[in-house]
């Protein structure tokens, strides 16, 4: 019990000093170039990503599949799954991050300039994990579950590092929109 108290106190102090909110993140998108008559003639990508504006543009099966595989308690918790986090910590197997935590990690990565700083966003440390927990809780206070899912679907790489967003991956791998998955 005394060892637990010795660990809990510094963790609590560390927690207090962590930010609760993410800085605004701008994510690369597709730009369509128009000629003098307004006719599109090229698309330029700052990232290989097609953003959707509504969850209605994604099939219910894709949404259900994401929640079932990544975070079955997504609609019950306020930022992270206690059982998933505890399971990952006790088994020392990694993982355990729910949808909001994964989103926060990705948004931090996009927000950090330079490879060294981006490495900090994904390094496997207890400090990073604790920071993600607090940021995920803060993110869930500001955003609805639907907003979180939509942002997740628009920012995560599906299937390969070059297929960011479910729409891009759906078109690339299946030749159809995400609404038809």
What is each PLM-predicted segment?
Residues 1-32, 40:
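N-terminal type II signal-anchor transmembrane helix
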Residues 27-181:
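Peptidoglycan glycan-strand catalytic modules in the bacterial/periplasmic cell-wall system
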């Amino acid at each position: 019990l005394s060892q637990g108290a010795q660990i809990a106190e510094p963790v609590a102090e560390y927690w207090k000093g962590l930010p609760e909110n993410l800085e605004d993140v701008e994510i690369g998108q597709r730009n369509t170039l128009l000629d003098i008559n307004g006719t599109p003639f090229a698309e330029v990508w700052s990232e290989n990503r097609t953003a959707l504006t509504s969850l209605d543009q994604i099939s219910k099966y894709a949404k259900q599949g994401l929640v079932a595989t990544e975070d079955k308690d997504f609609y019950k918790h306020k930022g992270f799954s206690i059982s998933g986090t505890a399971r990952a910590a006790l088994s020392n197997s990694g993982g355990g991050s729910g949808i909001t935590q994964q989103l926060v990690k990705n948004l931090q990565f996009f927000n950090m300039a330079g490879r060294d700083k981006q490495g900090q966003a994904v390094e496997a440390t207890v400090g990073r994990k604790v920071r993600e927990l607090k940021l995920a809780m803060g993110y869930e206070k500001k955003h609805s579950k639907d907003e979180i899912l939509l942002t997740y679907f628009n920012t995560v790489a599906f299937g390969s590092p070059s297929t960011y967003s479910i729409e891009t991956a759906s078109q690339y791998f299946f030749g159809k929109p995400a609404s038809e998955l």
